[in-house]
Design a protein with these regions (language model features):
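Conserved C-terminal helix/tail region of periplasmic/extracytoplasmic solute-binding proteins
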Residues: 302-386
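Solvent-exposed, polar/charged alpha-helical surfaces in well-ordered, non-transmembrane soluble domains
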Residues: 14-18, 38, 111, 164, ...
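Extracytoplasmic/periplasmic substrate-binding proteins
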Residues: 175-239
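Early extracytoplasmic/lumenal segment of secretory-pathway proteins
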Residues: 1-43, 346-349
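Extracytoplasmic ligand-binding site segments that recognize negatively charged/polar headgroups
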Residues: 33-193, 207
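Mature extracytoplasmic/periplasmic domains
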Residues: 237-316
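Tryptophan-centric aromatic hotspots in well-structured domains and transmembrane helices
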Residues: 10, 35, 88-90, 110-114, ...
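Loop/turn elements at helix/coil->beta-strand transitions in domains of secreted/extracellular proteins
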Residues: 2-4, 25-28, 118-122, 175-176, ...
Length: 386
């Protein structure tokens, strides 16, 4: 039967979540990020995906075991995440850089995001989770190097001490930050207005391709200290009306040819890991070989594939998923920290000047009101005398 698809886009995961949780919106399928999937399972907001597709093959097993394993780390009690969610796209957070002014060695070390050499030349993704992860990794880079703590432990540490450390580091970085970007980073990088952009790998793919068209060479790396890996996935909210159609749609999106078309359309990387995908992504013009055995299996231990889209196994080893903040108080503390970091753009001198100007304006308004009142009373007094 024919199914009409009504497509709606949200800029922020939490907006979609609120519409479902509070407004009981009857979306049949939504595609949130991994931490929202975790939250929705915890709040009993999802239906399990029925994989009885009749005569249609089940394409969901086409997903990479690596991604399935990562998703299942977020399972809640007896609720296995992969029973409720099917991964769609995935990627990393890292540094997009202009090769003419930034070396690969500089881009690889996240310490250079704090380097005064790059004053006002860096864009940061407008995402409190990604920025928190970066800052807390940088603050503990020596401990990571010594093996005292893992990237996963750090990025999921929401203690008061860790939040304070992250805030301190992000504020120290601010002289270098030209802006907090959600969608304009590619343009500014291509025009040379900024030299580095801490962003998502999918955005980096688009930026690299667009920059090449105008003769600008950009590249992307994951910091050697570590970073986060993320996933978006399909889920069926419990208020869905067309549950069967939703399940079939999710299965359809896991078909290899459809996955390839989606990758070509948006620049991000599908969670589907079939031989057809690998074959389509091999590029014999590349000089370097990558170990993608973690994703495609042992036969992909040395392949020529774009490392921006598919990171080498050694790169993935230094990445981890940032879990959801299970405690509302912890989430609130991080959001308040993020607000202070983004809002604290003014130095003390400017702040004092603003207070002085507004203070002077307030005094002037008070004096004007008083004088106006006195003139009014004086006129009344004169009328009475007449």
């Amino acid at each position: 039967e024919d199914i009409e698809i009504i497509y709606q886009v949200f800029d922020i995961n939490e907006v979609m979540l609120t519409k479902i949780e509070r407004g009981h919106e009857d979306y049949d399928v939504v595609c949130p990020s991994e931490y929202i999937i975790e939250r929705m399972i915890r709040k009993d907001m999802l239906l399990p995906i029925n994989r009885d597709f009749g005569n249609t093959p089940d394409y969901i097993p086409n997903l990479a075991p690596y991604i399935q394993d990562e998703l299942n780390k977020m399972s809640q009690g007896d609720k296995k995440v992969t029973d409720y969610a099917v991964a769609y796209m995935w990627g990393t957070a890292g540094t997009l850089y202009n090769t003419e002014v930034v070396t690969e060695e500089e881009a690889l070390e996240c310490a250079n995001l704090w380097n005064p050499k790059f004053n006002n030349k860096i864009l940061m993704k407008d995402s409190y989770r990604d920025c928190y992860g970066l800052a807390i990794i940088y603050a503990n880079k020596d401990r990571i190097a010594k093996g005292e703590v893992t990237v996963e432990q750090l990025m999921n540490d929401n203690s008061h001490e860790s939040i304070a450390k992250a805030e301190e580091q992000l504020k120290l970085m601010k002289p270098n930050i030209a802006g907090w970007e959600a969608d304009f980073g590619k343009e500014m990088m291509t025009k040379g207005k900024v030299w580095m952009n801490f962003t998502w790998s999918g955005d980096a793919v688009w930026a690299i391709e667009e920059a090449a068209e105008v003769g600008v060479e950009l590249d992307y790396v994951v910091p050697i200290e570590g970073s986060n890996v993320w996933f978006d996935g399909w889920v069926i909210p419990k208020y869905a009306r067309n549950v069967k159609a939703a399940s079939y749609f999710i299965n359809y999106m896991c078909r290899p040819d459809i996955a390839l078309r989606n990758m070509d359309a948006i620049g991000y990387v599908s969670a589907v890991a079939t031989p057809e995908i690998l074959e389509a992504k091999i590029d014999s013009t590349l000089e370097n070989y990558s170990d993608l055995s973690y994703f495609f299996g042992p036969e992909a231990d040395s392949v020529q594939v774009d490392p921006v889209q598919y990171p080498d196994k050694e790169v993935i080893k230094r990445c981890a998923v940032i879990r959801d903040f299970t405690n509302k108080e912890d989430l609130q503390k991080v959001l308040e920290m993020w607000s202070r970091v983004k809002g604290d753009n003014l130095n003390t001198g400017i702040v004092l000047l603003i207070f002085a100007v507004f203070g002077g304006l307030f005094v002037w308004l008070v004096i004007s009101k008083v004088n106006k009142y006195r003139r009014k009373m004086h006129r009344k007094h004169r009328r009475r005398r007449r």
